[in-house]
Amino acid sequence: MQDHDGLIARYLAVWNETDAATRRDLIALTWVEEARYLDPMLSAEGTDGIDAMVQAVHERFPGHRFRRTGAADAHHDRLRFGWELAPEDGGPPEVRGVDFATVAPDGRLASVTGFFDAAQG
């Protein structure tokens, strides 16, 4: 049985980690080497591409954190969960969305496709 909550927590920890070395370690625990990510604004292939993409988001949204919203849905090798990106010190989220993931046989992420529900400005 998959630990979907643990996988989602690691996935969000990747997005929130500002230390590059720690983030790369988290990526290796969370994503398969040939992983793919796609949302309306970003795309990345491979763990190096995912690391570069996350760093770019940190540069665009300094002082912000991703957090999960609500329960996850899962079946077979698929996973769906909501999230939001908001300032660490409170305030309304900049972006809300839902991610759909494919989980590899080893329990790591093979792919994530993100959709935005709402974005500020």
Segments the model singles out, each with a brief description of its role:
Residues 2, 16, 52, 58-121:
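A beta-strand edge to alpha-helix "cap/lid" segment located at domain peripheries
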Residues 2-19:
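Short, aromatic-enriched amphipathic alpha-helices that serve as compact interaction elements
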